[in-house]
């Protein structure tokens, strides 16, 4: 077959020179770079999933339940229990990972001539998804401590009048939390909708922004995922919680039968075993505290985190430091922020290997 490159294709001009999103997938002993839950699913969950798939396999010649009604019922029950906010399936929408959730929201509320504003550094897919939906992305820098500078944030929102504002809490890659008071201040000055990205909410003791939904029915959407705390990254299931009108909006842009029967069934099984799965959250939180404390003892600067990862520095060359960890068999994440790296919290043995490497690397003055 004739060899061609992207430059030979009639690609959209704004995509030329861009790079595909993705963390390195390398064959190393210790992988702490993608914020997965390191604990495998329980035997009971696996057995339940196998039995469920066996049951539905004879119906795979049929399209799946188009609107994922049973799954949305289960998600609503979980959110009601986890946040204390009473919701029903009419408040829930599910898709293939929170990335598809965010993409659908941008398709419905962004687009040509519209803007989305986010506080950087934050989840790197926000500007990528904005570009893919022809939505102009406005990046507002966080403060030196990586927290949102509220004075700057409110001033920029008033000046730029964005159609969408992203607030990620706990923030990825830094792990800090934006308070409900500050989220309300943002909502009150934002002319359009505010999407609060709570992908890591289960790791944080801070209250969920879902508690504000009744107060701001036309402006607030809370996005979540089952990829992190739920030990379900391979299942690719994201969802949002909002007023039912927002579900009506994304139904205008969603693809037909977008969630497969297998995805829906697997997510329902995971929710059925949520007590066991989420039992690992406390273990990971304890390990996060231990890892952060040890890094500080070694002389690293650590950003306070309420997630399943730790953001740390300061390095004069963070990529050289990343390579030094990799050379010691530990894969962590260089997210491109000067002087800093991010490590996912793994099982104790993985964290020990990471900390042993960190103890050696601090002496290299990288």
UniProtKB/Swiss-Prot annotation:
Keyword Amino-acid biosynthesis: yes
Pathway: Amino-acid biosynthesis; L-histidine biosynthesis; L-histidine from 5-phospho-alpha-D-ribose 1-diphosphate: step 7/9
Keywords, in A-Z order: Amino-acid biosynthesis, Aminotransferase, Histidine biosynthesis, Pyridoxal phosphate, Transferase
UniProt EC number: 2.6.1.9
InterPro entries in UniProt: Aminotransferase_I/II_large, HisP_aminotrans, PyrdxlP-dep_Trfase, PyrdxlP-dep_Trfase_major, PyrdxlP-dep_Trfase_small
Biological process (GO), any one: L-histidine biosynthetic process
Cofactor: pyridoxal 5'-phosphate
UniProt catalytic activity: L-histidinol phosphate + 2-oxoglutarate = 3-(imidazol-4-yl)-2-oxopropyl phosphate + L-glutamate
SUPFAM superfamilies in the cross-refs: PLP-dependent transferases (SSF53383)
GO MF term (any one): pyridoxal phosphate binding
Enzyme class, first EC level, given as a word: transferase
Positions of post-translational N6-(pyridoxal phosphate)lysine modification: 228
Matching CDD domains: AAT_like
Family: Belongs to the class-II pyridoxal-phosphate-dependent aminotransferase family. Histidinol-phosphate aminotransferase subfamily.
Quaternary structure and interacting proteins, as annotated: Homodimer.
Protein name per its UniProtKB record: Histidinol-phosphate aminotransferase
């Amino acid at each position: 077959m004739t060899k061609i490159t992207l430059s030979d294709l009639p690609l959209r001009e704004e995509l030329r020179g861009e790079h595909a999103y993705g963390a390195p997938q390398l064959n190393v002993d210790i992988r702490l770079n993608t914020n997965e839950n390191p604990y495998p699913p329980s035997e009971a969950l696996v057995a339940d999933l196998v039995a469920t798939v066996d049951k539905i396999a004879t119906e795979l010649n049929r399209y799946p339940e188009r609107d994922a009604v049973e799954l949305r019922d289960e998600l609503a029950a979980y959110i009601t229990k986890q946040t204390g906010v009473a919701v029903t399936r009419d408040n829930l929408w599910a898709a293939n990972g929170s990335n598809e959730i965010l993409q659908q929201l941008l398709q419905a509320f962004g687009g040509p001539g519209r803007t989305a504003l986010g506080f950087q550094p934050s989840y790197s897919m926000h500007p990528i998804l904005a570009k893919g939906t022809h939505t102009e992305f406005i990046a507002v820098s966080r403060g030196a401590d990586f927290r949102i500078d509220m004075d700057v944030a409110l001033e920029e929102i008033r000046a730029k009048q964005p159609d969408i504002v992203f607030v990620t809490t706990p923030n990825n890659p830094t792990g800090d939390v934006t308070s409900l008071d500050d989220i309300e201040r943002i909502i009150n000055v934002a002319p359009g909708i505010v999407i609060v990205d709570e992908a890591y909410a289960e790791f944080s003791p801070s209250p969920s922004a879902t508690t504000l939904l009744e107060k701001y029915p036309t402006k607030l959407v809370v996005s979540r995922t089952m990829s992190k705390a739920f030990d379900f990254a391979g299942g690719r299931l994201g969802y949002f919680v909002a007023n039912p009108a927002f579900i009506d909006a994304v139904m205008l842009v969603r693809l037909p039968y977008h969630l497969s029967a297998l995805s829906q069934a697997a997510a329902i099984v995971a929710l059925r075993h949520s007590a066991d799965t989420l039992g690992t959250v406390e273990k990971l939180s304890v390990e996060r505290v231990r890892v952060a404390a040890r890094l500080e003892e070694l002389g690293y600067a650590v950003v306070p985190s309420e997630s399943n990862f730790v953001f740390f520095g300061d390095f004069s060359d963070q990529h050289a430091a990343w390579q030094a960890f990799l050379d010691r068999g530990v894969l962590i994440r260089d997210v491109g922020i000067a002087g800093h790296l991010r490590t996912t919290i793994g099982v104790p043995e993985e964290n020990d290997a990471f900390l042993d490497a960190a103890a050696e690397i601090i002496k290299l003055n990288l």
